[in-house]
Amino acid sequence: KTQVSAIHNQLGEDVGISVEPCRRDTFPAIALATAYLVDVMHVAPSESVVVCPVDPYVEDGYFEALKELSEQADKCEANLVLMGIEPTYPSEKYGYIIPESTDHVAEVRTFREKPTADVAEQYIAQGALWNGGVFAYKLGYVMDKAHELMDFTDYQDLFDKYDTMKKISFDYAVAEHESKIQVVRFAGMWKDLGTWNTLTEAMDESIIGKGELNDKCSGVHIINEMDVPVLAMGLHDVVI
């Protein structure tokens, strides 16, 4: 809810926004958003959409890759089309997608949960890709899955009883049970900034915008989008 005003400021007041009444993990959230598009915005069930997290640090090519995912979903060769990020090291933080081939677009053989570094090296040797939680589908597909797995009639009904829905991820509820699933490789820059540590590691400078640190500060980062400067004094390990 705290992001609604910022989204309207950036994209305009006419942008449709559906806000979760409470947290219920990614499957109910995606089902709610899908029902909003179909039942409220009256988007055709045959339309393809892309779901992506908001916190990765990416290059412009990433957004072209999102378009490619949607176009691949339009072909109806698979019910789900995932983005597989080319691994740059054997990470223990991400799940892995094991494809059937090293083609740019390939069928998915299986998924693997977050492994140890040694096991991750084995996955990468098999051509595995990071699962960044980015995928495309036709609206009707997820609407059917939502009605199959949850008891609701339409968007408003789902919204009203949302707090009673089981907490479950989209991967567990849908992706890992789907046989018609493809992955599209992405080799561009992609870094998950889901924590303050990873955000500050990606910053080339400790201050973005107008700000000053005195000599008593250590481990302090300032991100200031306002014209009013920020002065930090005697702070340690803080993001402002």
Which role fits each region the language model picked out?
Residues 137-240:
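Left-handed beta-helix
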Residues 11-13, 44, 75, 103, ...:
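Short, well-ordered coil/turn elements that cap or connect secondary structure elements
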Residues 23-28, 88-91, 117-118, 190-192:
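A short acidic, often aromatic-flanked loop/helix-cap motif at beta-alpha or helix-coil junctions
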Residues 33, 55, 97, 138, ...:
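Residue-level signal for inorganic ion chemistry
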Residues 21, 52-54, 84-87, 100, ...:
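Fold-independent oxyanion-binding glycine-rich loops
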Residues 59-162, 182:
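Conserved core of the sugar-phosphate nucleotidyltransferase
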Residues 1-51, 57-64:
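Conserved N-terminal catalytic core of the sugar/cofactor nucleotidyltransferase
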